[in-house]
Amino acid sequence: MQETISKVRNSKPSSSNFFTFIQPILPIACVFFVICLVLILNRYFSFYASFDQGIFNQVFWNNIHGRFFQSSLSSSLSTNVVHANEIPTVYYHRLGQHFTPALLLWAPIYALFPNAATLAVLLVTLITAGGLMLYVLARQYLEPRLAVMITGSYYAANAVIGPTLCNFHDISQIPLFIFTLLLAMEKRWWWLFWLMAGLTVIVREDAGVSLFGVGVYMVLSKRFPRNGLAVCIFSFGYMLLLTNLIMPLFSDDISKRFMLERFGQYVDGEEATTLDVIWGILSNPVRLIVELVTPVGRTIRYLLGQLLPFAFIPAIAPASWSIAGFPLLKLLLGKGDSVLAINIRYAL
C-alpha cells in the first residue's frame, strides 16, 4: 500500500504534461461547465437575476472606474437606511457589510467585458476550476479512477450545483483557493500555501473560518503543527481585527445589522461585535447544544445533503471533520432560513 501511494505521489505533473495529467476528469468538468453556463446565462437573460447580481455588477463597475467597492444598492441594505430611515447614498462603501478585496483579482476580466453576464461566466469558471484543483489534490494519494470519482461527486453535489446556478457570489472563490492551499501543503510549497491563505481571508470577512479549520487539521494530525498553529493564529486574529477595527471604519453594519441578524440569539442589546457573539456562545453551553441540533429535521437533511454525494465517507474521516467542522459549526450556530439551505452559496 505504501509503495502504491509513493508511486502516485511521485507521478508529479510538469507543465508539459499537465493536460494529460488532468485528462481523465476533463469530460466531467466540461459537461459541468457547459450545462451550468447555459443554465445560468439563460437565467440571467430571462431576467431572473436577483438583487445580489446587481450589487456585484455595480461593485465591479465602480472598481474599474476607481470608485472602489462603492454601491448604492448595498447602501439600501445598510443599517443607516434599514434602521435609521436615511436615504441611500451613491458613495457608500460595501466593505462595511462584506470585506471582499479578492474581487479585485477579477477586475481586469470585467474591464474587458463590462457586463453582468461576465460575472455569471466567472462564477461557473471559478467553481469548475475548483473541481480541477480537487482532482489534482486527490491524485497526490489516489489512482486516477478514485480521484475521478471524488471529483465527480464534487461536480454532482447539490451544495456545488445550487450555488453555481444562482447569482454571482464571492464564496465561489473558496473551493479554488482552499484546494490549491491544500495541494501546496501536500507539496510543501509554503510560498504558495501562504499566498492562498492570504487570498482566502480576503474573500470575505468570515472566510478565515475555513482557513482556521485547515490549521486545526495541521495541528491535530501532527503533520505540520507549527505551520498549523500559525494558520490558526493568523486566521482567527485576522477575523477579529477585521470585524472589530477595520470594517467599522466604513460603516456600522457589521455590529448593528449582520451580527444580530445571524447570531443575535446569543447577545442582548441593539449591536454586537464578534467578541460579544463568541462570548455569548461559549458562556451558555446549553443554548450552544440546542442551536447545534435544532431545527432537527432541517439539520439532518442538510447534513445528508452534504454527505450523500460523497457516500458518507467524510462522516467517518477525522480529517474531514477537523477541516470542515468549523465552517459547518458557523452555519449550525446561525439563525435564519438561509443557513441550512443546501442549494445556495453558504453551503459551498
Put a short name on every predicted segment.
Residues 108, 117, 121-141, 180:
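Transmembrane-helix motifs of polytopic, lipid-linked glycan transferases
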